[in-house]
Structures are given as structure tokens and as C-alpha cells.
Amino acid sequence: MDHALLILVFLIGVAVLFDFLNGLHDAANSIATIVATRVLPPVFAVGWAAFFNFIAFLFFGLHVADTIGRGIVDPGIISDKVIFGALMGAIVWNVVTWLAGIPSSSSHALVGGLLGAGVAKAGTGAIVVAGVAKTVAAIFLSPAIGFMLALLLVLLVSWLFVKANPAFADRVFRGLQFLSASAYSLGHGGNDAQKTMGIIAILLYSRGMLGGEFHVPFWVVITCQAAIALGTLFGGWRIVHTMGSRITRLTPQQGFCAETGGAITLFAATSLGVPVSTTHTITGAIVGVGAAKRVSAVRWNVARSIVTAWFVTMPAAAAIGALFYAVGGLFLT
């Protein structure tokens, strides 16, 4: 096999591995609440989430892929070493946080890795400031919006069902959680898989393989959706436990509100091409439903440790990405 083609296949393989680990690491967010409320056992929940992760491309455009491909660093500086550094920065950080059971963001790990590798090659002038600012703003906005929507939904459904028989309300929201979990899984597949699509597409573009115009080939779309769905099937039970029960105890009603608030946030962000974190979004929503009950219902020490991981993720992945950019220079020539 031609050396250049071998390197291309290797880098696409690394990108698909990242997407798989994204499913393993982040897709637990899609099922944490439905598992915590005992509506579905984990083995069925992961299959449910994997299916909706896979079909997400049928519902959304590819705006997030475009942002990742052209809106974080200047496409003109993209090289094999930059892509390798970006992916390894995200993968290494994801593995470390997965082993520790910390729900950090795969999305911002990838952005951090791309920034670190891009700056290592071309300096800070390689940064697309507007795109990075949009992504950083999402760190704060996505959990805040998820929090507010979930809080308002809890207050609304509590008012609507205030006189309902508790057993009846429980049955209703157990059924509704199938819909809300499906919607959240669609949002996750729609936003997160597109980040890998953007990386592969910009790699192909940098090699002149897209006919001079940046776009995402259909085979890239299917490959990335399949990889994230398979990652979901292998699960991430440490993180499910943290997200679903250690932050606050959830009822089916609260689980429905958290998932619905999170799903609305993800749908809006994906439509606008904003690469947001599913971890940030569902955490904000879970905190919102817990706070609606009472502030003390939220285990703030657990939430605080998660927030700390958010702020560490991007710079840590950037440092790792810069390191692997240098490592890539040893064999990616």
C-alpha cells in the first residue's frame, strides 16, 4: 500500500476510534436518567440509545461538522500531524476521565486537542477566534439552558399533576421517558458524531480529496454514526452511576424533565452548528430538576467535581494534543 494512503487510513482509523470512545464515554449521558429511574435496565437502555444515536443523521444537517472542520483552526494549516495530535489529545483525556469515572466532555477534549496541535504547528494565529468563542460560550450556556428548561418543566408538570394519583403519574412518566430518552439520544448522535465527521472531512480536504470544496462525504457520515452507536453498546457504567444517581435521586417525572430539557438544548445547538457538550447539558438539567425539589437534594460536592473537570478538559487536551503533534513528527512524514 502507498505510504501516503497508509497514513490516511491510519488517521481515519484513529478518528473512528475517537468516535467509538465518544460513544463509550459520553453516550452514558443519554441513558443515565432512564437507568437511574429504573424505567429500563442498563442492558436494554444502551441498545435503545445506540439505535437513536445511529439514525440521528436522518434528522439533522451537518452544521456542527462544518464548525469543527473550518471553525476552530485555519483549514490551511491542517496536516496529518495536526489531525493526529488533535485526536490523541482527545482520546488520551477521554480514557483518563473514563477510568476515573469523571463525566468530562469529549467535545471540548477534541476542540482542545485541535487547538493544541494547531498552535503547536502555526502559533496562535491559526486559531479561528469566532469559532472558538462560540464553543467556549457553549461551555457556560448549554448547562445553564439545560438547567432552566428542566427546572421550568418540573414546575409545570408538578402543577399539572398536583392532584393526580401518584401511581398513575408514575406510569405516565415512565412511558414518557421512552420518548425523552430517545430525543436525547438523537441529540447526542446528531451533535457528537458530527465532530468526528468534521475531523475526517478536513483531513480529506487537506489532501485535495474533496474536489476543492469542503463537504462531508456520505460514507463518512455513516461510519461516524455507526462508531458512536457501537461505543454506546459497550456502555460507560461508571459515568452512568455518577450522572444518574450521585448528583441527585431521580423519579420518572424528574428524569423525563431532565432529558426533555437537555434534548431541546441539543436540538437547538445542533441546528445552529454549535458543538456543545452532552455531559454539560444533561448535568445542568439533572441539577435543575434536583434544585426544583429543594437545593439540598443536589449533591453539590459531586456537581462541583464535575464542573472542575469541565474547566480542566480543554487546556489538558490541548497540552496532550501539542505533545502528540510533536510525536507525530517522528513517523508522519
Regions found by a protein language model. Name each.
Residues 1-333:
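Multi-pass alpha-helical transmembrane bundle typical of ion/small-solute transporters
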